[in-house]
């Protein structure tokens, strides 16, 4: 298992998830070095009965470039975890590994599921005085053009509806100012496209 600390962090996190989701029918597929995983499982209490360990002796290094991960990643713990989602063996995948590789492998194996969406995004949710705010993209892409910013708005709306249960989320475009002349050309163009597409329910933040 990749990540900065491997199973020594992941397995205690699984144990906490088991406790928090007590009573729910949730099982865990753990991909990585079987011996290391089982050693960690033995130290965190009785959670092994809810876990299935799938051995993989290869990992994607934290400093490995996404393009290299795509060429050499098959058979790694990260690849196998995403492939389990693709084949319906898992409903979702959680990784503390190489973010760029996670995005690249996920896009390759899972594809973008809606027409017109080209890039995945990383979303973060946090509480505010008015409820939960979801922000994306927070790290999957270094640069984004106007069309991709609109895609993030579409994905953010769908995420908020599906995960947080809102019926009509407020959508805002983060910029250096609320005036139409402020910000990079890509941001100004994205704001225009969002308005024309009927997604504008907040304007610029």
Describe the role of every protein-language-model region.
Residues 1-2, 58-59, 98-100, 108, ...:
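Short glycine-rich anion-binding loops that position phosphate/pyrophosphate groups of nucleotides
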Residues 4-11, 37, 74-88, 92-106, ...:
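Short glycine/serine/threonine-rich phosphate/pyrophosphate-binding segments
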Residues 4-62:
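N-terminal glycine-rich anion-binding loop in soluble enzyme alpha/beta folds
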Residues 5-11, 21-29, 143-203:
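Glycine-rich phosphate/diphosphate-binding loop of Rossmann-like nucleotide-binding domains
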Residues 23-26, 47-49, 87-91, 98-99, ...:
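Short coil/turn connectors at secondary-structure junctions
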Residues 30-32, 52-54, 95-97, 123-126, ...:
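Short beta-strand segments
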Residues 45-90:
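Phosphate/nucleotide-donor binding subsite
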Residues 103-139, 197-202:
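Short, acidic/small-residue loops that bind anionic groups at enzyme active sites
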